[in-house]
Amino acid sequence: MLKQTIKKWNQSIERYESGNVGEALTILTSIEQSTSKINYNIGVMYIKSNNFRNAIEYFNRSVEQDKYLASSYYMRAIAHHMNGELNHAIVDYDETISKLRGHEYIDYKQLGLDHKLLLAEVLFNKALALGRAGSSVALQATQCFSQPSDSQEFKNQCKKIQDGSQLNFSTRPIPLSLLFKPPKVSDAPQKQRSATTSSIQSSSPSTPMSSSPPSYILKGPSSPPSSSSPSSSSPSLSSSSSPKLPPTPKPSFGSSPPPSSSSSSSSSSSSSSSSISPLTNKTLPPKPPPLPSKKLPSRPISCVIQDVKITLKVFYKDRRLIQIPVPCNLSTFIQKIELKFEITISDKFSLSFQLDGEENEINSQVQLDKMICMEINEINVKDIIPSPSPSPSPSPDKTNNSTSSYSSSSSSSSSSSSSSSSSSYDNKPKSSFIPKTTTRPILPPTTTTTTSTSNNFNRNATLPKKFGSTPSSPSFSSPSSSSSGGGGGPPIPTRGSPSISLLKQQNQTQSINIPPKVPTSSRPKMTQSHSPPSSSPLSSYSTSFQSVSSPSLSSSYNGSTSSYGGFSSSRPPPTPYPYQVLYTDSNEKYYLNTETNETFWELP
C-alpha cells in the first residue's frame, strides 16, 4: 500500500512538472491515505489553477494532520490574500510567525521541499495585507538577518511600504513550482541487503581451509620448511613409506577453526551493521522542536516591537499621572493633559518643568523633546493671571504751526461760509465745504485786553441754523442808543443764548458798533483781500466777509479738543493785540479794536 502511494506521488509530480496540472490533481486526489505533504501539494496545484477555495480546503486538511507544518499555514495565508480575504490572511501570517518559534527561517530540504521559509517574506506579505498600517511591520522585515536572494529589491519595496508611496506589490509565496517529494528509501534497503549477502557468499569458499594455519595455506603443501622439523635429517624417517604429516603449528601462529569462523562471522556482521547504520540514521526524521511554553495569541494585528511609554506626574490642582509614547509630539502631550484634568489648554494656562532650579516653559516641540531626553517626569500646569492693560495715552497736541493752520482753516471756512450763504436762497447748501469743528467757544468777557482765548466750551449747545438762513422764531433788536460811529445797519435777528446776555453787558459797558451789512440782493462777490477795511460799508463788507467763519455751524461735543482746519488742537490760535473776537446774536464773528472801539469783520 505504501509503495503504491509513493508511486502515484512520483507520477503526479512528473505530470505537474510537465505542465499537466489536471492529471497531477487527478492522480494525487485518488490516493486514499493522503498525508499532510500530499494535501499541501494538492493545495499548491489548486492555487496554480486559481481555484483558491479548494486550495484553502486542502491546506486546512494539511494543518489538521500536521499542526506544526508552517508552510501550510503560510500558503493558506497566500490563498486568502489572493482571494481578497485580508483579515484571514493576517491571522494565518501570525500563525506562521508563531510556528517559526523565534527563528528567522525553516529549511524544508530534509522533508522533501527544496525551499527556506523566511520570516522576512512572511512580514512583507503581512505588511501588504495591513496596507498603510503595515509600515512598522515592513521595518521589521528589513531588520531581519536572513534576507531573500534579491535583498536590494526587497529592501526597496519595504521602504516604499513604510513611506506609503506604493502598496500594490505582489505577494511572495513559496514558489509554486516546488512540491513536497516522496522519500527515496523504498529500494535502498533491498540493495543494501543484497550487497551484504554477496559479500558474505564470496567469503564462504575459504571456510574449509580455515582449519589449517594461514601460513601453511599461503606457502603451499609441497614445500614444508626444512628447519622447522629437526627429525627430517634422520634416515629412518625419510625411508619410511608413510605419508608425511604436516608439522604441528606453533601456538603463536595456530588458531582453532570454531573461533576463526565465529570471528569471521562476527567481523562480517559488524561490518554489515556498520555499513547499514549510517543509512538507517539518515532515513530517520529529525526530532521535532520543543513546544512553546506559552501559546502565542492569534489576532489580525500584532507587533513584535511595542511602543515605549513613559509615565509623567502632572501637578495642577492635584497630582495625576499620564502616559505618553516616545517619541511624542506636542499636540498629543497637550491632549492627554486636557483629558486627564478636563480642561482646555489655551492662553490661560502654562506648562513648565524644573531643570537645575530654573523653570522652563513647554511651548514648543523642542522644549518637549528636551524634557523627555533629560528624563524629567514632573510637569506643572499653572493659571496665567492677565496683567491689567495700560490706559491709552492721549495723542499729543499738534501745537506746531498753529497760527498758520488756523489762518488756512479760517480762509477755507470763509470760502465755505460764503458759498453756503450764496446758495441758501436756492435751498442747495454745500455742506461739504463747512469746516468740521467740534466745539463752540463762549464769548470772552469785555474787560480782558489780552489776546488769549477762553478754553471754556458750551457742551450743551445745539447746532444753530446754517449761515444765511432765517431762524425759526427770530426777535429783532437795534443797537444801543449810546453807540457812536458805525451808524445803524439792518436789524440783526437774535435768540436766547448765553452769548446774548454777555453781549448786552458788553454793549452797556462800552459802545460797540457792529459793522453794517448790505442787503443780500446787492451783496458783492467775495475777493481775496487782506487790506484793512475802508470807510464805506460795502468795501468793508466785501473785504472782511471772506474770513467770517461760524464755528457753531459744525460744532459738536468731542471731549475737550477741537479741530481747526483738519488739525487737532486744544485751543484756537490767539488773536493779535489790540483786537478781540466778538459774536453777534446770529453767531457771526467780528473783531473789536479795544483801543479805538472800531469793529471789523476781518482782521486788518
Curated annotation (Swiss-Prot):
A molecular function GO annotation: superoxide-generating NADPH oxidase activator activity
Annotated PB1 domain residues: 309-384
Keywords from the named record: Repeat, TPR repeat
PROSITE patterns, alphabetized: PB1 (PS51745), TPR (PS50005), TPR_REGION (PS50293), WW_DOMAIN_2 (PS50020)
Ranges of biased composition (kind: Low complexity): 194-215, 225-243, 261-284, 396-424, 435-453, 467-483, 529-570
Region of interest: Disordered: 180-298, 383-581
Name assigned to this protein: NADPH oxidase activator
Gene for this chain: ncfA
Domain of life: Eukaryota
Gene3D superfamilies on file: Tetratricopeptide repeat domain
